[in-house]
């Protein structure tokens, strides 16, 4: 009996494989597509197809990423796999692939390694809510006690970084065995996907969050008033809704939406993802400028001080050729505009080299609307020298 064709009615989640180099992330990705394609849920992708990751540009940074999609009985997944460690760091920090959950791959032969730890920490910093563990290469370890020890070590590490190490699923298997259709290991791949289905939660969709639209442009329509255009980032906006306009150092403005224009038609509502023009009552064109945001009243506040997890580009990536020191003052490109900010380095860090990834303190010269998870590029003279996201608002 043929399985039904792909349908969009299943909930969609973004996940990815993370973990130390050579622990089997790409092999596992290939095994998942193989086992699920045998069940009729997707097309299988070979190791080489996944490993040969195309280059992508995200916020001015080149990243190699492979995208694979597959379905389980309950969900549709978009899965990212990166060939190199630097690609993972860049991917997670820039949010090129926003992950709703991750599969942490740890080889039973090695146990947790430095990049295992680093990826868990990054996941915590960039807000990956939950992780499922796949202990790989279990077929190469014949000591049950050793397997138990490795599992305990992984659970402790997850707990250390504030994940639920005690209750999170750990599946012991062999990615290569699953890929090669070995009857001992195929069920473990199925078990892993069931664990993803049950443990990784569906994210709150953008349309369910409060309304927010960054302003890209402003103009006047004679007889109608002021229109601000942009792409609605989150939420839904209806005609008649009260809104606030904040950011760029200006006093908070309040207004009412008198219409929403899309494709040269006036509509009653706009939602996340729409490019729209919002007609605002009683607001002069001079009062709004690019870089401000229009929001549901009270949902976001402007802030100027925050902590952030950042990746600084290497020279070969078009970044700086030299390190920078404390009190470095680049521009922070947030949503639609540049704001100058001052970077304070962590205690004990003298300078930051191109290619580094670290946590910094930033003070912007003018406050902008922000919440934890907000992404930005760091620019200098119009070129991107780094990227990051807000991990904590300090003032």
Curated annotation (Swiss-Prot):
The annotated region (G4) lies at 136-139
What are the UniProt keywords, alphabetically? Answer: Cytoplasm, Elongation factor, GTP-binding, Hydrolase, Magnesium, Metal-binding, Nucleotide-binding, Protein biosynthesis
The UniProt entry, under SUPFAM superfamilies, shows: EF-Tu/eEF-1alpha/eIF2-gamma C-terminal domain (SSF50465), P-loop containing nucleoside triphosphate hydrolases (SSF52540), Translation proteins (SSF50447)
- The tr-type G domain extends over 10-204
Region of interest (G5), ranges? 174-176
GO MF, one term, reads: GTPase activity
Q: Where is this region: G2?
A: 60-64
Q: Name one Pfam family in it.
A: GTP_EFTU
Span list, region G1: 19-26
E.C. designation(s): 3.6.5.3
Which reactions is this enzyme annotated as catalysing?
GTP + H2O = GDP + phosphate + H(+)
The record's section on Gene3D superfamilies has: P-loop containing nucleotide triphosphate hydrolases, Translation factors
Does this UniProt record's set of keywords contain Protein biosynthesis?
yes
Ion transport keyword on record: no
| UniProt record similarity statement | Belongs to the TRAFAC class translation factor GTPase superfamily. Classic translation factor GTPase family. EF-Tu/EF-1A subfamily.
| Quaternary structure annotation from Swiss-Prot or TrEMBL | Monomer.
Name of the protein this chain belongs to: Elongation factor Tu
Origin species, per record, is Flavobacterium psychrophilum (strain ATCC 49511 / DSM 21280 / CIP 103535 / JIP02/86)
